[in-house]
């Protein structure tokens, strides 16, 4: 769902 996408984006930002 939309929240899952948000969590994925947060994960990508955290890896930067």
Curated annotation (Swiss-Prot):
Q: What is this protein called?
A: Aurein-2.6
Keywords, A to Z, come to: Amidation, Amphibian defense peptide, Antibiotic, Antimicrobial, Secreted
Where does it reside? Secreted
- Annotated family: Belongs to the frog skin active peptide (FSAP) family. Aurein subfamily.
- Leucine amide PTM positions read 16
InterPro entries annotated for this entry? Answer: Aurein_antimicrobial_peptide (IPR013157)
Report the main location listed first in the record: secreted
Question: Which species is listed as the source?
Answer: Ranoidea raniformis (Southern bell frog)
User: Which tissues is this protein detected in according to the database?
Assistant: Expressed by the skin dorsal glands.
Q: What Gene Ontology biological process does one annotation of this record name?
A: defense response to bacterium
- Say yes or no: keyword Endoplasmic reticulum present: no
What is a single cellular component term in the Gene Ontology annotation?
Answer: extracellular region
| Biological role | Antimicrobial activity against B.cereus, L.lactis, L.innocua, M.luteus, S.aureus, and S.epidermidis. Probably acts by disturbing membrane functions with its amphipathic structure. Shows anticancer activity.
